[in-house]
Structure formats: C-alpha cells, structure tokens
C-alpha cells in the first residue's frame, strides 16, 4: 500500500508530522493493506492562515483493488484533529466496505462449517 501525503501552500510541510501521519495510517489501516493499492492524504487550510473555527481540512482517498476510490473529508481547528477525524472516518468506511464484500449472501455460513466434535 503506497501512501502519499500533500499539503496546500498555506500549510508548512513538517517532515516529522508527515512521518507520524504515515506511521499512523499504516498502523490503523494495516488490516486493509492487501486490499488497497494507494492512500492519498491532502491537508489544507481553507482560510489561508486564519484562526477562526474549523478551517483546516483533511481529505483521505483510498484506492481499493478493482473498485472505485473511496473519499472522506474532515474539518477541524488543528491539523492533528483534522487528520485523526479523517482517519477514523476512512477506517469505518473501509471496514463497512470490505465487511460487506466478505459477508454477503452465498458466503460461508457457520451452519455449513465442518464440526470439530466427533460424536
């Protein structure tokens, strides 16, 4: 799973922060890594440096194998809060998406699984 993090011209690109975000993404989304080709993260300051309200935005786009991309957005007052909110959202969306594909009608059922008990 490839991870690309970018910022707009209004945010300073801090190497340590970017590295910590990459580590967090790899950790939280590890269970989906074999089903994703790429993650794109874009951080932006919509007010251009203003300090009022939730003007920092994080967009995470996940690219599942053989599926349409999935996008989430979160706005917050700090870069960390915007990122963590978006990470939580993408984790939930991917769990729902991949949970549905592996638990659909016609899938394996506990009723049809071989029993370990020999009577």
Which residues are covered by each model-predicted region?
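N-terminal, polar/charged subdomain of small-to-medium soluble alpha/beta proteins
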Residues: 1-119
């Amino acid at each position: 799973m490839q991870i690309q993090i970018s910022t707009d011209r209004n945010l300073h690109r801090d190497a340590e922060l970017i590295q910590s975000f990459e580590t967090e993404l790899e950790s939280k989304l590890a269970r989906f890594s074999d089903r994703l080709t790429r993650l794109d993260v874009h951080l932006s300051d919509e007010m251009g440096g203003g300090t009022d309200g939730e003007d920092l935005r994080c967009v995470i786009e996940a690219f599942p194998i053989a599926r349409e991309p999935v996008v989430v957005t979160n706005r917050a007052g700090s870069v960390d809060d915007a990122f963590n909110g978006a990470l939580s959202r993408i984790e939930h969306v991917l769990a729902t998406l991949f949970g549905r594909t592996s638990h659909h009608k016609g899938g394996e059922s506990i009723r049809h699984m071989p029993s370990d008990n020999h009577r």
